[in-house]
């Protein structure tokens, strides 16, 4: 979205992961390069 784009700019909220969650994400990523949104949400909200 450029500065001249019409309409309100909606930014996605970033998820802050704990160190333990990052380790789990890295393990998952090792086996599967793409983590579905559902899986990321599951890992973010234990």
Curated annotation (Swiss-Prot):
Q: Which keywords does this Swiss-Prot/TrEMBL entry list?
A: Developmental protein, DNA-binding, Homeobox, Nucleus, Transcription, Transcription regulation
Name the DNA-binding segment ranges: 1-46
Q: Which domain of life is it from?
A: Eukaryota
Matches recorded under SUPFAM superfamilies? Homeodomain-like
Gene Ontology terms describing biological process: anterior/posterior pattern specification; embryonic skeletal system morphogenesis
One GO cellular-component annotation of the UniProt record comes to: nucleus
In the record, the note on similarity to other proteins reads:
Belongs to the Antp homeobox family.
Job description of the protein: Sequence-specific transcription factor which is part of a developmental regulatory system that provides cells with specific positional identities on the anterior-posterior axis.
Recorded protein name is Homeobox protein Hox-D3
**What is the species listed in this Swiss-Prot or TrEMBL entry?**
Ovis aries
The top of its lineage is: Eukaryota, Metazoa, Chordata, Craniata, Vertebrata
Gene behind this protein:
HOXD3
